[in-house]
Amino acid sequence: MELNFKSIIFLVFVSLTLYWVYRILDWVWFKPKKLEKCLREQGFKGNPYRLFLGDQYDSGKLIRQALTKPIGVEEDVKKRIVPHILKTVGTHGKKSFMWVGRIPRVNITDPELIKEVLTKYYKFQKNHHDLDPITKLLLTGIGSLEGDPWAKRRKIINAAFHFEKLKLMLPAFYLSCRDMVTKWDNKVPEGGSAEVDVWHDIETLTGDVISRTLFGSNFEEGRRIFELMKELTALTIDVIRSVYIPGQRFLPTKRNNRMRAIDKEVRVRITEIINKKMKVMKSGEAASAADDFLGILLECNLNEIKEQGNNKSAGMTIGEIIGECKLFYFAGQDTTSTLLVWTMVLLSRFPEWQTRAREEVFQVFGNKTPDYDGISHLKVITMILYEVLRLYTPVAELTKVAHEATQLGKYFIPAGVQLMMPQILLHHDPEIWGEDVMEFKPERFAEGVLKATKSQGSFFPFSLGPRMCIGQNFALLEAKMAMSLILRRFSFELSPSYVHAPFTLITMQPQYGAHLILHKL
């Protein structure tokens, strides 16, 4: 009897051991090889799967090597920004894949397939599973949602970004841009010139714009929150770049503790501002409360709740509103600052376009304060900004995940496969833009984006489809205001000390700053 019991225990133990051995082998080997076979049978090419590492080690090595030396101003930025993608496409062709650990990441470069991926957001979603608890302290708000929760949140936030609401933010844009121009004015003698690292000041500008537009009269408090968010961003990037060890982010390390402390302080500070706003709104002064983005967001949230029969679950909670404020800081600052700095660098290299842009600003505004109607008529500056976004795409690639087995065009995509859409490759593709693709030619956008891309939908610096960046118009409006004030006061050129070294720090930034010679007009 005792022997039989021991035999049963032994058999159960062996069975469980074999089961878990199989599960582990399936996870680390059989499943990746099955996915690889499926892709190869459809004509996709890539390196053979390697246990655990995939292509990540080699990709990281290529990126580190690319960042060791700058490039010439006329050289292709892709070899510094996406050397790993260039190597994959160069070796295996456009129809290729890379390995991210045990997951294949397929390159999608066909504009029609990209439109399908970005339009069918319910099938192809963000890879949230790669985010650990610490990283999620930063990546919050609508960007972290999918499906119905995303649709509900987007409806509320869309109302806050309506162009009539954006008009209300124009004075904040002007004040922040004026402050930066005044700062430069004090550095440059009358009728003279001076070298300025404009990148540092542009970062400060876009941070101030976020603080002013988000919190209005609580601007100084907003500045403190911005500094905290900037520190949290730097720490998060450090986490993303480090080797992932399961459970490591739960450990009470100095970095983890600091990130949690920042998150707690940011939440407390934003909550205090929200409570002040809510108190004003409840006192019947809703109009005075809705003079900044936070007030507008709270107003839109209350309106949505009322429209749904005072159903509070139809709106956002205080915690969710805090998440949107954090996302606004994180996403709203980087894109505009990189757009502005590369615009100034390119206009330094092409003075004829700088002159055309300046003439347009004086023609539209003279010496008056730029207004919404005038900014909407800045055709030359719009062309220039689009061309800068094409050549120096803020985010080089987008990645989605097939959360279920699905058909993409003529291809079958198994569940779990990642789809990478390298915008920068499409934006630099001579088959789409012509042989002059790497030249700075804003005139290619003279008749709009559709005409420039031959209606192919191959220009998407702010993504495409229902999940297109909600802050696109905000960023462009801010950039036009800034360039209008800069061009009226200064001409500029590259300094001899300028070092051309674009690199990716979430967005494409100048690794060693942007040293320009400013000439006071």
Swiss-Prot record:
The protein's Enzyme Commission number: 1.14.14.85
Glycosylation site positions: 107, 311
Transmembrane segments: 8-28
Role description: Component of the seco-iridoid and derivatives monoterpenoid indole alkaloids (MIAs, e.g. vincristine, quinine, and strychnine) biosynthesis pathway. Catalyzes the conversion of 7-deoxyloganic acid into loganic acid. Not active on 7-deoxyloganetic acid.
Name under which the protein is recorded: 7-deoxyloganic acid hydroxylase
Upregulation: By jasmonic acid (MeJA).
GO cellular component terms, semicolon-separated: endoplasmic reticulum; endoplasmic reticulum membrane
Family designation: Belongs to the cytochrome P450 family.
Catalytic activity entry: 7-deoxyloganate + reduced [NADPH--hemoprotein reductase] + O2 = loganate + oxidized [NADPH--hemoprotein reductase] + H2O + H(+)
Gene transcribed to yield this protein: 7DLH
Phenotype upon loss of function: Reduced secologanin levels but accumulation of 7-deoxyloganic acid.
Keyword tags: Endoplasmic reticulum, Glycoprotein, Heme, Iron, Membrane, Metal-binding, Monooxygenase, Oxidoreductase, Transmembrane, Transmembrane helix
Cited Pfam families: p450 (PF00067)
